[in-house]
Curated annotation (Swiss-Prot):
[4Fe-4S] cluster 1 binds at C54, C57, C60, C109. This is NADH-quinone oxidoreductase subunit I. It comes from the Bacteria. It is a peripheral membrane protein. The keyword Repeat applies. One of its GO terms (biological process) is aerobic respiration. GO terms for molecular function: 4 iron, 4 sulfur cluster binding; iron ion binding; NADH:ubiquinone reductase (non-electrogenic) activity; quinone binding. [4Fe-4S] cluster 2 binds at C64, C99, C102, C105. Its main location: membrane. GO terms for cellular component: plasma membrane. NDH-1 shuttles electrons from NADH, via FMN and iron-sulfur (Fe-S) centers, to quinones in the respiratory chain. The immediate electron acceptor for the enzyme in this species is believed to be ubiquinone. Couples the redox reaction to proton translocation (for every two electrons transferred, four hydrogen ions are translocated across the cytoplasmic membrane), and thus conserves the redox energy in a proton gradient.
Length: 183
């Protein structure tokens, strides 16, 4: 009946939105902030004394659905210690040509050595530069940290490192409860 008015209604919607504020961001000049839980580039973390948290267990590589992570473990010695445990990640690479930034590797890491930053600008001109090595992924040394290799500074055994930040009384109570449950 009044079908000839349909194009006019469509133009009404167009004119109505023409005068609204544009939500477009001028990206290279103005960067929108990311959400706190955004999955961006990976980072290999360190203990407060500078030793690496990665123990070279390769669980992150096994959990990766895109097969983007390559880990090769090395043995720690008392002369050259890179992490508190027996082993460390001697070779660590993430291929960002394959990585889908899903975060499954972070969930698989038993020592919380691997986290994801908010950095999302990973584009580059060459394929070789998108394969990040351990040196590129390691968190920078903060004040008070010493570059590895060096002896353990935060305790005598690796258990001392893994108990950092935990309530020692709670750990002792848990040990007592476990021993009582076994008996």
């Amino acid at each position: 009946m009044l079908e000839w008015l349909n194009p006019v209604k469509g133009f009404g919607v167009t004119f109505h939105t023409m005068f609204k504020k544009v939500p477009t961001v001028e990206y290279p000049e103005v960067k929108a902030p990311t959400m706190p839980r955004f999955h961006g580039r990976h980072q290999l973390n360190r203990w407060p004394d500078g030793l690496e948290k990665c123990i070279g267990c390769e669980l992150c590589a096994w959990a990766c659905p895109a097969d983007a992570i390559y880990v090769e473990a090395g043995d720690n010695t008392e002369e050259e210690r890179y992490s508190p445990g027996e082993r460390y990640g001697r070779v660590y690479q993430i291929n960002y040509l394959r990585c889908i930034l899903c975060g499954l590797c972070v969930e698989a890491c038993p020592t919380r050595a691997l986290t994801m930053t908010n950095e999302y600008e990973l584009a580059d001109d060459s394929r070789e530069s998108l394969i990040y090595t351990k040196e590129q992924l390691l968190a920078p040394l903060q004040q008070g940290m010493e570059a590895p290799p060096h002896p353990m500074r935060l305790g005598e055994t690796e258990k001392d490192y893994y108990r950092l930040g935990r309530d020692d009384n709670a750990a002792a109570r848990a040990d007592e409860q476990n021993s009582e449950a076994v008996q």
